[in-house]
């Protein structure tokens, strides 16, 4: 008697390029490139030159993606133990360590070369310093060494507006440093909100995030204080004449919203609120820099 025919569905296998793309943290890099673009646009009163604009965004984006890939490499052990990151390419074995290292290094070299030859050496070296700051100083050392890891290491993540500025002008300017200060003040409350939500996971892998070492309530207080500092930092562009009334009104509303969310977290906490604060902080930074961009062209 003939055997009944069975039909089996093919098992979908992830495409290799998706694993490489995931290692570059594309959503994080996209937000970072927005701040680069704003730095570029604010550096000049009129239209931004096309060559440094495109080459700068591509080169900085490549080196940022390389830094993210190095982060995946260095954190692969603890990533495999945390619910948020266990499905990343390296813990799951979708990419070998050798291939990941080759990919990250190739991206870094190509990005640096593009910035050096098509933009300017200053931007290339500053971007390289940011890569070292994030991938080596923060990820390999500070993250595991001190609960102030994100405060000290946050400087590397705050550099993109300065990189955009130097890509267009080839020089430092105080206005660009004000944008760096804004992101520097934004970084701790952004990451500490996530750390509260993932406190048990960080404790499990012995990463001394502030909620692990000093407790959740202390961290909530620090988040509130930093949102106030951030609100003050957001006023700097107005005080020095960089921005006009549109940015002033918009940034004030965003600052009040962030302070209110931090107040809720401290005094009216409920399940899931820490992640709400984390997500709000992302929209806060994105909208703030869009305000800077729109106000620049309206005000100038």
Swiss-Prot record:
- One Pfam family hit: UbiA
- Gene Ontology CC: plasma membrane
Q: Which BP terms does GO give this entry?
A: heme O biosynthetic process
Q: Pathway, according to UniProt?
A: Porphyrin-containing compound metabolism; heme O biosynthesis; heme O from protoheme: step 1/1
**Record-linked InterPro entries:** Protohaem_IX_farnesylTrfase, UbiA_prenyltransferase, UbiA_prenylTrfase_CS, UbiA_sf
GO terms of molecular function: protoheme IX farnesyltransferase activity
Recorded catalytic reaction(s): these are: heme b + (2E,6E)-farnesyl diphosphate + H2O = Fe(II)-heme o + diphosphate
Membrane disposition: Multi-pass membrane protein
Which keywords describe this protein according to UniProt? Cell inner membrane, Cell membrane, Heme biosynthesis, Membrane, Transferase, Transmembrane, Transmembrane helix
Q: What is its EC number?
A: 2.5.1.141
TM regions (residue ranges): 28-48, 50-70, 106-126, 150-170, 176-196, 222-242, 243-263, 280-300
Quote the subcellular location field of this record.
Answer: Cell inner membrane
Entries under NCBIfam families matching the protein: cyoE_ctaB, PRK04375.1-2
- Family membership noted in the UniProt record: Belongs to the UbiA prenyltransferase family. Protoheme IX farnesyltransferase subfamily.
Tell me the function of this protein.
Converts heme B (protoheme IX) to heme O by substitution of the vinyl group on carbon 2 of heme B porphyrin ring with a hydroxyethyl farnesyl side group.
Q: Share any extra remarks.
A: Carbon 2 of the heme B porphyrin ring is defined according to the Fischer nomenclature.
Specify the protein name. Protoheme IX farnesyltransferase 1
């Amino acid at each position: 008697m003939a055997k009944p025919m069975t039909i089996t569905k093919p098992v979908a296998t992830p495409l290799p390029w998706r694993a490489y793309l995931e290692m570059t943290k594309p959503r994080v890099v996209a937000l970072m490139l927005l701040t680069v673009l704003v730095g570029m646009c604010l550096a000049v009163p009129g239209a931004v030159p096309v060559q440094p604009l495109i080459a700068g965004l591509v080169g900085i984006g490549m080196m940022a993606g390389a830094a993210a890939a190095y982060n995946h490499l260095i954190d692969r052990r603890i990533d495999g133990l945390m619910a948020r990151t266990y499905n990343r390419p390296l813990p799951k074995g979708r990419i070998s360590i050798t291939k990941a290292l080759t990919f990250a290094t190739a991206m870094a070299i190509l990005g640096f070369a593009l910035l050096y030859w098509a933009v300017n050496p200053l931007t290339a070296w500053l971007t390289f310093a940011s890569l070292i700051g994030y991938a080596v100083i923060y990820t390999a050392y500070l993250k595991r060494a001190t609960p102030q890891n994100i405060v000290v290491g946050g400087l590397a993540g705050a550099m993109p507006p300065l990189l955009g500025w130097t890509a267009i002008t080839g020089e430092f300017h105080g206005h660009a440093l004000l944008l760096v200060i804004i992101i520097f003040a934004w970084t701790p409350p952004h990451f500490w909100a996530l750390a509260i939500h993932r406190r048990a996971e960080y404790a499990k892998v012995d990463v001394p995030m502030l909620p692990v070492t000093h407790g959740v309530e202390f961290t909530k207080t620090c988040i509130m204080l930093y949102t106030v500092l951030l609100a003050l930092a957001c006023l700097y562009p107005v005080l020095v004449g960089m921005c006009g009334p549109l940015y002033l009104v918009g940034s004030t509303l965003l600052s009040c919203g962030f302070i209110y969310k931090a107040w809720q977290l401290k005094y009216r906490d409920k399940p899931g609120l820490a992640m709400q604060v984390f997500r709000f902080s992302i929209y806060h930074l994105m909208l703030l820099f869009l305000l800077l961009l729109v106000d620049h062209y309206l005000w100038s």
